[in-house]
Curated annotation (Swiss-Prot):
Entry protein name: Spastin homolog
Gene: spas-1
Catalytic class of the enzyme: isomerase
Species of the source: Caenorhabditis elegans
Binding locations of ATP: G279, P280, P281, G282, N283, G284, K285, T286
SMART domains per the UniProt record, alphabetical: AAA
Signal sequence range: none
GO cellular component, one term: cytoskeleton
Annotated region described as Disordered, given as residue ranges: 110-182
Intramembrane segments: 275-294
Keyword list, A-Z: ATP-binding, Coiled coil, Cytoplasm, Cytoskeleton, Isomerase, Membrane, Microtubule, Neurogenesis, Nucleotide-binding
Annotated effect of mutating K266A: Does not abolish microtubule severing. Disperse cytoplasmic localization
Function: ATP-dependent microtubule severing protein that specifically recognizes and cuts microtubules. Probably by regulating microtubule remodeling, plays a role in new synapse formation in GABAergic DD (Dorsal D type) neurons.
Phenotype upon loss of function: Slow growth, reduced brood size, abnormal oogenesis and multiple vulvae. Progressive locomotor defects, which is rescued following exposure to the drugs guanabenz, salubrinal, phenazine, or methylene blue. Lifespan is prolonged following exposure to the drugs guanabenz, salubrinal or methylene blue, but not phenazine. Increases numbers of centrosomal microtubules in early embryos. Reduced neutral lipid levels in intestinal cells.
């Protein structure tokens, strides 16, 4: 039972939130009790009533979580934060169980993908097949089934995406109880079997793939967490990235061209399986990855150190095996690892056992005995410290491309695109852009964006504060070249000569 201490006088927001929390918990408990009673022999009507209770509980819990923490008295904020986390777990459990019940009473129910409920992992509760009942005649049986389906569609069409995920589930668990976060699974991995997935259905966010096929040979808990790392269409295209021409060409050869005619890219023409993007911070490495995700028709995994590491012994290796197995099941696919040096730095005797095993597992899965020459998996790594990577890691990235600081032409292009994107080019001419680009030598892409933002603030600072609230945005004067001179007094290059010297040395020795 969740108990709230009584709030101080006047803390109306706290009282309202506490009451909503309590109501949601009570409704959730009632739903679970009815679920327990009807899970084996309950009628369709009873199951639909259980679904209604889960919907009501989820609605109350969702309302309870819609508040501003700053409206809560400071002495109660810690308490509310703890209860908020618990209630979010309950809301997730209610949604999962609601999906399972809708699948039980009518597995064929379909629901619009524009429902208000966001995507979630498959229901952890089991699908219980309703027991067959006798009917005096086939006509009566069919009529009863049609009536049940109509009632089920009525329940499942009022805001919850009951049929959004049609994942096969097992018959081991019966109902969902409020539970703590999932801990490391110690179950052995299933025997790995290659599954051919219809490539026309990829990527998953554009046309749903059979999740059971993707998760074949993968621990379910780990697999569902990895599928959450699939990067949706970002809206970024290669043309949006200024400069970086060599990196664009390499990515086009490895990703886009083979998709147009795979038969041409076999044997010696087979695309590389590893591309390392390195360079000073803020020069478009991650943006290029987003552009690849936006233009390719492949499943794109956006992986960071936190996605692979775990405090539980053995979990990191399981996660890496699961990542590459899902990528094989869905190939062609792309794995992007940002700040790859944080997990694959040079191995040494000082490494912890967990770290050493994780690095070894990654290298084996990337290009080892378990990999195949026919695998169409591209691994893209991004780092600004390539000299710290292990030699075995570098060997697996035959394309090592440096994204250098933008030259004057690239700076002109980036400044122009940034200002046009925000409709702020009216007060500037081409000679102004050339002047700004010529005075920003050593600036990275992110430095130039920061410079544009600072210049855009100069006209705002000229407005009297007493008139600021009544000023129309369209009446603010246009940005001038002199505003960039003012901005240059505060915005400086963020890349030091020491960093550039190290990166240049690495590029001469190992770069393409």
């Amino acid at each position: 039972m969740f108990a709230f201490s009584k709030g101080p006088a006047g803390s109306s927001t706290y009282d309202r939130v506490a009451q909503k929390f309590q109501d949601g918990y009570e409704k959730m408990r009632a739903a679970i009790e009815m679920d327990e009673l009807t899970k084996h022999a309950g009628s369709i009507q009873e199951k639909l009533r259980t679904a209604e209770l889960y919907k009501e509980a989820r609605s109350l819990l969702k309302e309870a979580n819609e508040f501003n923490i700053m409206d809560i008295p400071e002495t109660r904020r810690s308490e509310i934060r703890d209860k908020r986390q618990n209630m979010m777990k309950l809301e997730k459990s209610a949604q999962d169980r609601l999906i399972a019940i809708c699948n039980e009473v009518d597995p064929n129910v379909k629901q619009s993908r524009s429902a208000t409920v966001g995507p979630s992992r498959p229901a952890s509760a089991a699908r219980v097949t309703p027991r067959p009942t006798r009917a005096t005649a086939p006509e009566k049986k069919n009529a009863a089934k049609a009536k049940e389906n109509d009632e089920n569609r009525h329940v499942c069409s009022r805001g919850d995406r009951c049929g959004a995920h049609h994942q096969p589930v097992t018959k081991k668990s019966d109902t969902v109880h409020p539970e703590p976060p999932v801990q490391a699974s110690n179950r052995k991995m299933e025997t790995v079997k290659r599954v051919k997935v219809d490539k026309a259905s990829l990527p998953m966010h554009q046309n749903p793939v059979n999740r059971a096929a993707l998760l074949n040979g993968v621990d379910k808990v780990i697999g569902e967490r990895l599928l959450d790392e699939v990067l949706d269409n970002t809206g970024v295209r290669m043309d949006d990235v200024a400069g970086c021409h060599s990196a664009k060409a390499a990515l086009e050869e490895a990703v886009i061209l083979p998709a147009l005619n795979p038969n041409l890219f076999k044997g010696l023409r087979q695309p590389v399986k590893g591309i390392l993007l390195f360079g000073p911070p803020g020069n478009g490495k991650t943006l290029l990855a987003k552009a690849v995700a936006g233009e390719s028709k492949q499943m794109f995994f956006n992986i960071s150190a936190s996605s692979l590491t775990s405090k539980w012994v053995g979990d990191s290796e399981k996660t890496i095996r699961g990542l590459f197995q899902i990528a094989r099941n869905a190939q062609p696919s792309i794995i992007f690892i940002d700040e790859i040096d944080s997990i694959l730095c040079e191995r040494s005797e000082k490494d912890a056992e967990v770290s050493r095993r994780m690095k070894t597992e990654f290298l084996v899965q990337f290009d080892g005995a378990t990999s195949s020459a026919d695998d169409r998996i591209l691994v893209i790594g991004a780092t600004n410290r390539p000299h710290e990577l292990d030699d075995a890691v570098l060997r697996r990235f035959p394309k090592r491309i440096m994204l250098n600081l933008p030259d004057e032409e690239a700076r002109k292009e980036l400044i122009t695109k940034t200002l046009k994107k925000h409709n702020m080019m009216d007060g500037l001419i081409s000679s102004d852009i050339r002047y700004i680009a010529s005075n920003t030598s050593g600036f990275s892409n992110s430095d130039l964006v920061a410079l544009c933002k600072e210049a855009a603030m100069v006209p705002i600072r000229e407005i009297d504060r007493s008139k600021l609230s009544m000023t129309d945005g369209e009446k603010i004067r246009k940005i001038r070249a002199s505003d960039f001179d003012t901005a240059l007094r505060t915005i400086r290059p963020s890349t030091s000569q020491k960093i550039m010297s190290k990166l240049s040395d690495f590029s001469r020795s190992f770069g393409c």
